Each structure stands twice: as C-alpha cells, then as structure tokens.
Design a protein with these regions (language model features):
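C-terminal nucleotide
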Residues: 16-177
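Gly/Ser-rich oxyanion-binding loop with an adjacent helix/lid
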Residues: 1-23
Length: 177
C-alpha cells in the first residue's frame, strides 16, 4: 500500500517511479464518440451484485502490489502485463453483470489485435488499457515515440471515430488547489 494514500484525493507518487515511466506516453484512441449504453455510475452499481466482484477485489489487491513493484523497478514488461490483464478483467466483469453489457466495439478489438501483433513483431513495449468504454489507451516510453506514432497513424486511426486520437504523456502529478 502506498503511504499517505487516500480514496478522497490524488497523492503524488512520482518520486517513487523508475525514471523510464516518467517518459511514458498515454495516447488515447477515440473508437467511439457516442454516449455509453451504461454510465460509469450504473456500472459501479451493477458490481454490487456481480458474482465475481469479491474475486476481482482480491485480485486487484495483489495486482496493485505487483504494479507498484514494477513501477519502482522499471519493469516495463510486468507493468504492461498487469495493465492489459486489468483492462480485460474490467470488461469481462461488465459482460458478467446482471444484466450483462458490452461497451467494447469492433474497432476496440481490432486495435487490441494490432497492438499485440505490433509488439510481437517489433519487440517494442507498446501496451494498451481500456477506459470504461470502447476507447483504447496506448502506453509506451518516449524512446519509441516516432515508431509508435507512425504505427498509430498508418494502422490504427482507421478504427477511430473520424480518425480521432489524443496524444498525451505523463504529467507532473497532482497539485493542491
């Protein structure tokens, strides 16, 4: 557990990060601009009765410890593995809710498949995660920016709504207001 953590406000943790993570990009592929069929608030309520929620909570605790260790050690492969498993897990729970729902779109799945193929072929640490909707976040170190952004433009934008994506990167952390 991170010291001085809070469920109420953001707590800076950047001083614990391995320097490689300070250079990370988080480019967001906008697969759909449509309103989600199930809001995040409604999705959280559906978790209350999800038969797999307790298992999920236990799994998340273990993965959080692994993630913190990966972030401290600069273990990009472990970071990416956990990141992607969490994305799959979240959307799997949505499909197992009562009633079940699916926020992924065909473009989401196509992008995921392309990212797996790109990583396997190029040996570049490009990983994805998913927000609570169809959009895909691509995370990678700045060292690979040119190659990854060319891949986005040449291979992935066709799956984005109106070719929309938001190039972004790690910021300076939370600031007290």
């Amino acid at each position: 557990e991170a010291q001085d953590s809070s469920d109420l406000y953001a707590v800076g943790w950047g001083h614990h990060l391995h320097p490689i993570f300070a250079t990370f990009h988080d480019d967001i592929l906008i697969i759909s601009k449509e309103e989600k069929g199930v809001s995040s608030t409604a999705g959280h309520k559906l978790m209350d009765d999800n038969p797999y929620s307790e298992t999920r909570y236990m799994t998340v605790q273990g993965r959080m410890k692994q993630m913190l260790a990966a972030l401290k050690a600069g273990d990009i492969e472990l970071f990416g593995d956990i990141l992607e498993k969490e994305a799959y897990s979240l959307h799997g729970l949505m499909m197992l809710s009562n009633p079940p729902y699916l926020l992924l779109r065909p473009g989401t799945v196509s992008v995921i498949e392309k990212v797996h193929e790109f990583r396997r072929t190029n040996k570049i640490p490009l990983y994805f995660t998913l927000d609570a909707g169809p959009n895909v976040h691509l995370l990678y170190p700045d060292l690979h920016k040119e190659v990854v952004q060319a891949f986005i433009k040449n291979e992935l934008l066709r799956y984005c709504s109106e070719g929309s994506y938001i190039p972004d990167k790690v910021g300076n952390g939370p600031k007290q207001l």
